[in-house]
């Protein structure tokens, strides 16, 4: 008997299917992998993983076949759970990695659980079901869900489905997703409020990508750097995640839906539209024009903005104007008057007064100090 060092997704899937057919019951992933490793015999040669090509060159069919052949280490070998429903990044994300991707195996028994990392679920084909405390979300092909740490949920893929999960350590998510929004702090603050609400209630972002090939290719390369392990793998995987989020925000930000247990999907999504409108029209938007655009009365909209951002409308718009002014002062040779006009101030003295109040010096002094 030779010591077993890995099992494949296909072996786990076959074991789960055969047990379910024989008994009508499902086993957990941990139980199946433990049983396979206890057999202490590997029936297959080590899977051949393509090293010489980029996985985004694989067709979807080739990639799906590769997913089933990927080797899975004994993740739970040295793990002793302190809670039945809370799973930390270790053992799920291997030591030394900040990103890890897995394929959802059918006929696996799961349970509602939470963890301390971010989880991105995506469906290539079929359906993937996510069960939250008071809601079930079904993902169809091309749909994607980002689940926040601490959210209690259960996930299972329907028969003959291809669904994957990308798991990202919390600090890595912070340094990729929110960094991309660094010049749109209004949106970043709102997403951060939703995703870091420190509750067991459901908190997630939902995207529709129309089964885009660019999304497929990006996910394939993330998997590549999770399984072809060398001294560059983790750095490359983090870079791939950065690119992946860039693709989502560039091409599919208009499809974002937000769910937070404390508020309905519609309310959160409508407020996101309000923030996006403020972000895109900060030079000219007024509270009156915003109310007319979204059909709210002024007092209600003021309270809604403060509740979701912790700031009032005037402060938000002023910060957006001055943040853009800083960028123009730093990266262009435009005159102070031109910058004032571009960011929405039609009186340069008024602009300078606001700028000095926030940054403790007038715009000209700030530029000369660079």
Language-model regions, residue ranges each:
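Generic protein-terminus/edge-of-domain signal
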Residues: 1-127, 350
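A hydrophobic/aromatic-rich effector-binding and dimerization subdomain
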Residues: 2-9, 55-58, 62-92, 96-98, ...
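N-terminal regulatory/effector-sensing and dimerization cores
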Residues: 98-188
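Short, Lys/Arg-enriched, Trp-marked, Pro/Gly-tolerant hinge/linker segments that flank
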Residues: 206-208, 229-237, 248-276, 280, ...
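A long, hydrophobic alpha-helical segment
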Residues: 215-234
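Short helix-capping/hinge SLiMs at alpha-helix to coil transitions
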Residues: 280-282, 331
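Basic/polar phosphate-binding segments, predominantly the helix-turn-helix DNA-binding elements
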Residues: 284, 288-320, 340-366
């Amino acid at each position: 008997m030779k010591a077993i060092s890995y099992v494949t997704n296909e072996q786990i899937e076959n074991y789960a299917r055969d047990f379910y057919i024989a008994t009508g019951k499902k086993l957990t992933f941990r139980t199946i992998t433990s049983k396979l490793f206890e057999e202490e015999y590997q029936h297959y040669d080590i899977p051949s993983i393509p090293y010489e090509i980029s996985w985004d060159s694989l067709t979807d069919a080739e990639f799906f076949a590769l997913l089933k052949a990927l080797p899975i280490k004994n993740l739970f070998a040295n793990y002793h759970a302190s809670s039945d429903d809370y799973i930390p990044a270790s053992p799920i994300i291997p030591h030394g990695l900040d990103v890890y991707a897995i394929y959802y195996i059918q006929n696996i028994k799961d349970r509602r659980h939470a963890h301390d990392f971010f989880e991105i679920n995506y469906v290539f084909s079929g359906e993937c079901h996510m069960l939250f405390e008071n809601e079930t979300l079904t993902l169809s092909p091309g749909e994607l869900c980002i689940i926040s740490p601490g959210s209690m949920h259960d996930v299972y893929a329907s028969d003959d489905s291809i669904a994957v999960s990308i798991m990202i350590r919390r600090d890595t998510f912070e340094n990729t997703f929110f960094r991309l929004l660094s010049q749109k702090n209004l949106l970043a603050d709102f997403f951060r409020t939703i995703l870091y609400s420190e509750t067991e209630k459901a908190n997630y972002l939902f995207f529709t990508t129309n089964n885009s090939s660019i999304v497929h290719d990006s996910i394939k390369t993330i998997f590549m750097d999770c399984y072809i392990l060398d001294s560059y793998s983790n750095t490359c995987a983090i870079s791939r995640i950065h690119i992946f989020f860039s693709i989502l925000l560039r091409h599919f930000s208009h499809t974002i839906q937000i769910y937070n247990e404390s508020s309905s999907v519609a309310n959160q999504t409508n407020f996101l539209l309000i923030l996006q409108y403020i972000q895109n029209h900060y030079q000219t938007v007024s509270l009156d024009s915003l109310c007319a655009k979204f059909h709210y009365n002024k007092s209600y909209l003021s309270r809604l903005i403060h509740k979701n951002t912790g700031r009032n409308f005037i402060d938000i718009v002023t910060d957006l104007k001055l943040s853009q002014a800083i960028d123009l002062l730093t990266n262009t040779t435009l005159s102070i008057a031109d910058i004032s006009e571009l960011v929405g101030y039609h009186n340069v003295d008024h602009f300078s007064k606001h700028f000095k109040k926030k940054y403790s010096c007038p715009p000209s002094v700030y530029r000369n100090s660079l």
